[in-house]
UniProtKB/Swiss-Prot annotation:
GO terms for cellular component: plasma membrane; proton-transporting ATP synthase complex. Its EC number is 7.1.2.2. GO terms for molecular function: ADP binding; ATP binding; proton-transporting ATP synthase activity, rotational mechanism. Keywords: ATP synthesis, ATP-binding, Cell inner membrane, Cell membrane, CF(1), Hydrogen ion transport, Ion transport, Membrane, Nucleotide-binding, Translocase, Transport. Its main location: membrane. This is ATP synthase subunit alpha.
Length: 513
């Protein structure tokens, strides 16, 4: 086809008219060094603290050090193929993770990507991992309980919704077991759970996921994994990712429980990053802001007011408070609670459950030391029936420990002392509990009633466990409606007291155990 000169000029004019000049400003820089997951970048002028920097190969780094002539960033993922001279680019975005109900029942990594082989996740949106905690006015006091199902915890160190309760102890003292049982006990309570595994073996995490599935608790739990094989950056960020997922429920007037297992390993990961970034080390080589590392995380666990929820949901949810309860775990070395990270977290939290290796090794499990375990705000949230009946437990144990130490040196003891020692031994025996067998409020109330009103006085020490099992079986079979109602209401009055008395009287009179 032949075109004459006029047609050609018309075509060129038409193309020129259609041409648009698109100016796209990109903030790019160049990698000048790569070492141990830390990259130094030259040429990024408008980068924010914590901003995501796009790397070659669909990967990201997070800007942590903003210096005069370079930026120190930590790589999220493998870094072995990164080299000097590679070009990187600012994204203008802070790290966000997917949030929503679609994450329940799933196992995800720090960035919210599924790692359980169950396909894609339908999330409800994204949330920044770093959020400022609710202010004083937006909060509400803690007055609703979180039942762990453990007699020793719910009676002596009760936990409320919106509280931060530290679980602290040496390795192999049952810290994770206590937290996992607390999650299992929420399967029918409506509390959504998030379990954040930091620096653990993949086999250990797989075992936890399997146990949650076996006990029907995985369907309302999100498992966030930053295993020992992951980079220090992902281990450092995992708790913040899990917290953002929990805040989704809190801000919509629901209740959530988050377990950080454990924050000692997160602090070590952060120390590694800080030293590689050449930040000045302080006590135990931790950086100066290691307190802020944990305080800004744990302050996000709170109970928020109806007004806060209504404002956040733009009026969709009215008259509901939301809560995020945190159970951070800290591992101590040879029972040293005065080390840097343990003292920091103790001062941030609203109480601690101290697990002792001596108690654990002598068969007292959960190995809760009632002398130094406290709950600073949970007392107001304790159910009425447990609060009323558990009053004498801590006193009995304190007196028993004092007398037991004294009795080692005394040859003959008077009747009153012998009675107190026997009572203390029986209370200690009764507070023992197997893993994966949480008790309901009514079951705990019945057992505590038996202690409080002397029903164990004629029971031999080695028969306490058998007595308890038979009593609970009898009550759940013959008084099922009463037990269900007591668990639901948690009230305590003369009528309930008389019914509990009747249950125990009839059990002791008619049942052989």
């Amino acid at each position: 086809m032949q075109l004459n000169s006029t047609e050609i000029s018309e075509l060129i004019k038409k193309r020129i008219a259609q041409f648009e000049v698109i100016n796209e400003a990109r903030n790019t820089g160049t990698i000048v060094s790569v070492s141990d997951g830390i990259i130094r970048i030259h040429g990024l002028s408008d980068v924010m603290q914590g901003e995501m920097i796009a790397l070659p190969g669909n990967r990201y780094a997070m800007a942590l050090n903003l210096e005069r002539d370079s930026v120190g960033a930590v790589v999220m993922g493998p870094y072995s193929d990164l080299a000097e001279g590679m070009e990187v680019q600012c994204t203008g975005r802070i790290l966000e993770v997917p949030v929503g109900r679609g994450l329940l029942g799933r196992v995800v990594n720090t960035l919210g990507q599924p790692i359980d082989g169950k396909g894609e996740i339908k999330n409800d949106g994204f949330s920044p991992v770093e959020v400022i905690a609710p202010g004083v006015i937006e909060r509400k006091s803690v007055d609703q309980p979180v039942q762990t199902g453990y007699k020793a915890v719910d009676s002596m160190v009760p936990i409320g919704r919106g509280q931060r309760e530290l679980i602290i102890g040496d390795r192999q003292t049952g810290k994770t077991a206590l937290a996992i049982d607390a999650i299992i006990n929420q399967r029918d309570s409506g509390i959504k759970c998030i379990y954040v595994a930091i620096g653990q073996k993949a086999s250990t995490i797989a075992n936890v996921v399997r146990k949650l599935e076996e006990h029907g608790a995985l369907q309302n739990t999100i498992v966030v994994v930053a295993s020992a094989s992951e980079s220090a950056a992902l281990q450092y960020l995992a708790p913040y990712s899990g917290c953002a997922m929990g805040e989704y429920f809190r801000d919509r007037g629901e209740d959530a429980l988050i377990v950080y297992d454990d924050l000692s390993k997160q602090a070590v990961a952060y120390r590694q990053i800080s030293l590689l970034l050449r930040r000045p080390p302080g006590r135990e080589a931790f950086p100066g802001d290691v307190f802020y590392l944990h305080s800004r995380l744990l302050e996000r666990a709170s109970r928020v007011s109806e007004e806060y929820v209504e404002k956040f949901t733009k009026g969709e949810v009215k008259g509901k408070t939301g809560s995020l309860t945190a159970l951070p775990i800290i591992e101590t070395q040879a029972g040293d609670v005065s080390a840097f990270v343990p003292t920091n977290v103790i001062s941030i939290t609203d109480g601690q459950i101290f697990l002792e290796s001596n108690l654990f090794n002598s068969g007292i499990r959960p190995a809760v030391n009632p002398g130094i375990s406290v709950s600073r705000v949970g007392g107001a949230a304790q159910t009425k029936v447990v609060k009323k009946l558990a009053g004498g437990i801590r006193t009995a144990l304190a007196q028993y420990r004092e007398l037991a130490a004294f009795a080692q040196f005394a040859s003959d003891l008077d009747e009153a002392t012998r009675k107190q020692l026997s009572h203390g031994q029986k209370v200690t025996e009764l507070l023992k509990q197997k893993q994966y067998s949480p008790l309901s409020v009514a079951e705990q109330a019945l057992v505590l009633f038996a202690v409080e009103f002397g029903y164990l006085d004629d029971v031999e020490l080695n028969r306490i466990g058998t007595f308890e099992t038979a009593l609970l079986e009898y009550a759940n079979y013959n008084y099922a409606d009463f037990m269900a109602e007591l668990t639901k209401t948690g009230n305590y009055d003369d009528e309930i007291k008389n019914t509990l008395k009747t249950v125990l009287d009839q059990f002791k009179a008619n049942v052989a155990w």
